[in-house]
């Protein structure tokens, strides 16, 4: 079935095109990737897209799915974490647990200034409205991620975003180009039920805060526990934003939990 997917796309050539031209050029490949399983998509990407390869993970609620899925095919693939210094204690323990359980090749990137230095210089940016949140995300998520992609010489970036998670992700394709590299989303069409079954099947767990009512987990100061009547999007960034920037294509980027 993998052989039926269109021929290997050339990143260097695609980078000479406009964004619209890139989308059109990759459209047929995306059509042919849609009916494949997530495992088949990962295999196709590893065989046909530019390396080096890497996975970005926020080690959020469903992070174990993507980490397990890709490392089953490429055990030594770098796992990029952008650490803000404000993650939950449970998240740091979850990182340690999954790193040991899956033998992850974890690469941690941080902002050039410490969290304390940033607060001294700018105040609490996350309390300064959308503009403050975007500046915070640029410093703590976007810049470290771009540095990681460059230093690791990444040609293809795997991420666990899913269309079901938010309106901003609903129209995303499996394969695109972002920050000058291929962006590949093998579980983009998975439902929460698909995620649950995969975790059960492979003896994996949700983030520990799942049991306490969290649907999405990021920094302690911009993550809220889900309450009746709230959408998943409203549990992050006070409902002002869904994305932290890592997955937005205009240079401000989009993360949040992904997987």
UniProtKB/Swiss-Prot annotation:
Gene for this chain: cysH
Subcellular location(s) per record: Cytoplasm
Keywords: Cytoplasm, Oxidoreductase
NCBIfam families: cysH, PAPS_reductase, PRK02090.1
Annotated Pfam families: PAPS_reduct
Protein name per Swiss-Prot or TrEMBL: Phosphoadenosine 5'-phosphosulfate reductase
Any GO molecular function: phosphoadenylyl-sulfate reductase (thioredoxin) activity
Keyword Oxidoreductase part of the UniProt annotation: yes
InterPro entries referenced in this protein's UniProt entry, alphabetically: PAPS/APS_Rdtase, PAPS_reduct_dom, PAPS_reductase_CysH, Rossmann-like_a/b/a_fold
GO biological process: hydrogen sulfide biosynthetic process; sulfate assimilation, phosphoadenylyl sulfate reduction by phosphoadenylyl-sulfate reductase (thioredoxin)
Gene Ontology cellular-component annotations: cytoplasm
Purpose: Catalyzes the formation of sulfite from phosphoadenosine 5'-phosphosulfate (PAPS) using thioredoxin as an electron donor.
UniProt similarity note: Belongs to the PAPS reductase family. CysH subfamily.
PANTHER family from the UniProt entry: PHOSPHOADENOSINE PHOSPHOSULFATE REDUCTASE
Pathway it works in: Sulfur metabolism; hydrogen sulfide biosynthesis; sulfite from sulfate: step 3/3
EC number: 1.8.4.8
Catalytic-site annotation from UniProt: 244 (nucleophile)
The species this protein was found in: Vibrio parahaemolyticus serotype O3:K6 (strain RIMD 2210633)
Protein's UniProt keywords contain Oxidoreductase: yes
Reaction(s) catalysed by this chain's protein: [thioredoxin]-disulfide + sulfite + adenosine 3',5'-bisphosphate + 2 H(+) = [thioredoxin]-dithiol + 3'-phosphoadenylyl sulfate
